[in-house]
């Protein structure tokens, strides 16, 4: 049985050291989370699986790690300075602020229908309704009042202001003088660093079309209403690819990446049947998008929410950042750029003439991936003896701890010395973290490692060192290996243990 509430998952994450509230000892900071000892391991394993699949296992990909703070001109010409905003609305009764679409989505169906009726829109076309509310702010606030839109915090009908745009980028000052010439932004997405480094990568690697640039890194969005644990946060981490293709081949590559990404999620334990593919309606597309597929995972505690977007960005991005735009025959409509000093073109693979490539962008959030993987792995089981156990049935390559080595008696050197030697040998295999667990209570150790998803527990006992009562000589120099999922226990020779573990975890 999966987690039945977000609270259940949050409780496990804190109790077992996966995720903590940011700045918790000062009351916490909304939309910011810290990853604990096991959380950072799981997060790193997810990122490693993504990097291995998309960089190491392909011949057409390069990596990049661009800076977090960006020149304001980058985000001006990318369109973010003008368009990276959401309509917000305030309740004057309690000074609470909400994102317009989130507030409306939280209302009962009859309230939504009433708002739509007043605005002359259909409640079935939510995006068009939100667009109408944003376009007519005075009418929107009146519609909210007449329809009785309630404040999610107080539960009472609010006194709503006119909605107004709120730019979600974090602005910062660069250098010692704070003026209008010295500001920049924390990047709202990792993509722009890839586009501005396009020429550097091409020149240094001699890449030809098609090829991609992959990046994992932090991005920052000043969300109006961060919520649902790590699903919607203000500091996030992204795994993004910008895959550059010859114009005219973009639709074929779009389908290629859709299938590739669905397979990757399946390999991480997120079943394909739990992911709906949303072909984003034209009116909902981002300003740069020709077409976008959103992968909507059915979170057990949230319902269907976006886990990844796969966008056909056409030639918008490189076209926006390049000089000499008028000479390049761009398909996308871009603002004139007199600030860039680079011509972001590449030889066409057939004609050898300079061309601005189209871009296919698979973009996934590490935090949302964490939440999906944890949600899918979280299992409550009733054992044969009637006891209940919680177990994280993580894929072994994602498990924060691969193996726990447990001495049955922590005060007996004969046993602890063998356990420590086994731990050192297994750690040397390079499979991930191996933990020496000397809590002293084997039952509690098993339960703890079930909850954190450790695939195998290796127990060194008295039989291992020939000190057990009526010890069977065949048990000497063997250990008990317990399987997390089946609870089966098997005696394995110490001399064969490393190979046994390698075969199971690889």
UniProtKB/Swiss-Prot annotation:
Q: Which Pfam family is one of this chain's hits?
A: tRNA-synt_2b
Please state what class of enzyme this protein is. ligase
Q: Which domain of life is it from?
A: Bacteria
Q: Does Glycoprotein show up as a keyword for this record?
A: no
Report the SUPFAM superfamilies cross-referenced here.
Class II aaRS ABD-related, Class II aaRS and biotin synthetases
Task: List the catalysed reactions.
Answer: tRNA(Gly) + glycine + ATP = glycyl-tRNA(Gly) + AMP + diphosphate
Q: Does the keyword NAD apply?
A: no
Q: What is its EC number?
A: 6.1.1.14
Residues where substrate binds: 99, 189, 236-240, 361-365
Q: Name one GO biological process term.
A: glycyl-tRNA aminoacylation
Compartments (UniProt record): Cytoplasm
Binding locations of ATP = 221-223, 231-236, 306-307, 365-368
Q: Name one GO molecular function term.
A: protein dimerization activity
Family from the record? Belongs to the class-II aminoacyl-tRNA synthetase family.
Q: What does this protein do?
A: Catalyzes the attachment of glycine to tRNA(Gly).
Mind telling me what this protein is named? Glycine--tRNA ligase
Protein source organism: Deinococcus radiodurans (strain ATCC 13939 / DSM 20539 / JCM 16871 / CCUG 27074 / LMG 4051 / NBRC 15346 / NCIMB 9279 / VKM B-1422 / R1)
